[in-house]
């Protein structure tokens, strides 16, 4: 029996002979402005068509968005277990290697491996996922799992773990608890994270809300002469959507320059659908530090906002307690902004 289907985003051609289904062509347009995903394979169908194929082998070819190389995927299974391997043609290590098992009640991925060599910041790790009640559809399935992320920079290796669930993903109302814990290292910077959060809303417009205790920290060297002793981003109560960041955005920076001195800066403000080129972030800032070459201390305070792509300082007051250079001393010089 020949099978053919031609739709707007799907093209299918195959042959069914007894329990054997041969797919000679399956093209699926999965991403806008991208070539279709192409799949071919052979499957053994159950005697009673009330479930998944009994066994099968399928291969697919696809393009990754924003990446030039083609990706090949291969899926094998026999009875209730199998393996999915995804390979980029320009890279020897699999992007995905997922051994899986399936029953009528549960889908399990155990000790899966993944890697992402792109964007100049290679990542890799392990993945385990459990989906209970999967046959009842996405709206009723209970999802939980663990994803580890390994990074490496000049500061050494870093490891972070994302635990998720148990919860559900829904086209209308997702409810999935998440927690990211660990560290990442790139160049001379180390980033530490403890981020409990809740994913909610529809899958087409999700909301990620950070819960009490959510904190990002970092330390290291940005440029040769400036050392970051610590920078902290408290994120409790902050929400992230497709439109941007909402909530109280804060940062506390402690740093030093070996010859010029050390300093502390604070920034605290309210964000509304904020992105670097859209939305609004209104803030105030204050800080103090030392200026060793002139035996001085300094302070700064003010207000400002980041609206769309424009940064505006509305208030600024900064000055030194003194400036000493040789036998000359200047007492309490100060700069105050008259207008934005």
Predicted regions and their residues:
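Extended lipid/amphipathic-ligand handling interfaces
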Residues: 1, 9-19, 27-30, 37-51, ...
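Acidic, low-complexity segments
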Residues: 66, 92-93
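PAPS-dependent sulfotransferase catalytic core
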Residues: 210
